[in-house]
């Protein structure tokens, strides 16, 4: 517990345990990508948390699949900021830097990651692994370092951003009770 005069006491947080619990209990995280203007572009992504428990491996990481028929995710730089949410409240819990690796198709590592993702993919139709092999990208996001935000150290702003226009968020037809059809 650390105390500064005039501020409430802050209890030390075991970030490793908190990350493992938050990542294993949630299926969505946010990825912040620099957009060139200085303001980050934030993408909500479905992921699977996986730890191969191999001491020679990369350690626990978030596996993300994107591409045709899957979630949209732009090309990611070598390092991004990830925001993990609390399963209980849905609010941000941890904000960490993460290294990004793109897995090469046809490698044993890609095949293993595809199987981990396939097992957790809801409402999958057909052979998703074959579809991913044709046109999807599998990335491994490995969080590291001290968190930018954690319990007791949150930034003051809310983090709200307008929804980016996309096929899933843009409405063309609205029901009449939502100011959609003309009255006449």
Question: What are the functions of these language-model segments?
Answer:
Residues 19-20, 70-74, 114, 129:
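Short amphipathic alpha-helical segments and helix-helix/interface helices
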Residues 26-68, 74, 80-84, 94-96:
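Short beta-strand segments
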Residues 15-17, 42, 69, 126-127:
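A generic local structural motif
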Residues 1-28, 160, 164-165, 172-174, ...:
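Extreme N-terminal tail/first-helix region
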Residues 10-14, 75-84, 118-125, 129, ...:
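Short amphipathic alpha-helical surface micro-motifs
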Residues 89-184:
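Charged, gly/pro-rich active-site loop segments
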């Amino acid at each position: 517990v650390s105390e500064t005069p005039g501020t409430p006491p802050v209890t030390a947080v075991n970030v490793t345990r908190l990350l493992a619990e938050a990542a294993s209990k949630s299926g969505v995280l946010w990825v912040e990508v620099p957009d060139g203007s200085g303001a980050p572009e934030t993408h909500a992504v479905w992921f699977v948390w996986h730890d191969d428990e191999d001491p020679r491996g990369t350690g626990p990481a978030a596996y993300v699949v994107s591409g045709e028929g899957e979630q949209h995710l732009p090309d990611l730089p070598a390092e991004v900021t990830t925001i993990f949410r609390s399963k209980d409240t849905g609010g941000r819990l941890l904000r960490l830097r993460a290294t990004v690796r793109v897995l090469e198709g046809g490698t044993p590592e890609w095949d293993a990651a595809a199987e981990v993702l396939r097992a957790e993919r809801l409402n999958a139709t057909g052979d998703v692994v074959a579809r991913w092999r044709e046109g999807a990208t599998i990335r491994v996001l490995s969080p590291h370092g001290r968190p930018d935000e954690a319990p007791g150290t949150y930034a003051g702003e809310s983090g709200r951003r307008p929804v980016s226009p996309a096929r899933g968020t843009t409405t063309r037809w609205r029901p009449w009770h939502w100011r959609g059809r003309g009255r006449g």
